[in-house]
Structure formats: C-alpha cells, structure tokens
C-alpha cells in the first residue's frame, strides 16, 4: 500500500506540473482536479497502510 501511496503522490505532482505550466486554459483546471484526486488517493493509501500495520 505504501508503494501505491507513493505512486499516487508522484502522479499528483506530474498532474500539477502539466496543469500549472499553462499549456492551455483547460489543462490548468484538469491538472488541479487530478492533483487533488491523486493526492487524496495517496493520503488514503498511506493511512490504510498505517492502520493495517503491515509492511509493504
């Protein structure tokens, strides 16, 4: 699960970079949405990993 959290975090950062670079007006909104979606998934995965107590 920790690997999934890290993967979601990296995807969130990449989505933000593409969205914030100003390629197109719509890409900014899409990048922001993807940032929050994947950041939320990363946090959820990390919390589940902490609660379950299993090692990755």
From Swiss-Prot:
<protein>
    <recommendedName>
        <fullName>UPF0391 membrane protein Bd1438</fullName>
    </recommendedName>
</protein>
<dbReference type="Pfam" id="PF07043">
    <property type="entry name" value="DUF1328"/>
</dbReference>
<comment type="similarity">
    <text>Belongs to the UPF0391 family.</text>
</comment>
<dbReference type="InterPro" id="IPR009760">
    <property type="entry name" value="DUF1328"/>
</dbReference>
<dbReference type="GO" id="GO:0005886">
    <property type="term" value="C:plasma membrane"/>
</dbReference>
<feature type="transmembrane region" description="Helical">
    <location>
        <begin position="33"/>
        <end position="53"/>
    </location>
</feature>
<keyword id="KW-1003">Cell membrane</keyword>
<keyword id="KW-1133">Transmembrane helix</keyword>
<feature type="transmembrane region" description="Helical">
    <location>
        <begin position="4"/>
        <end position="24"/>
    </location>
</feature>
<keyword id="KW-0472">Membrane</keyword>
<keyword id="KW-0812">Transmembrane</keyword>
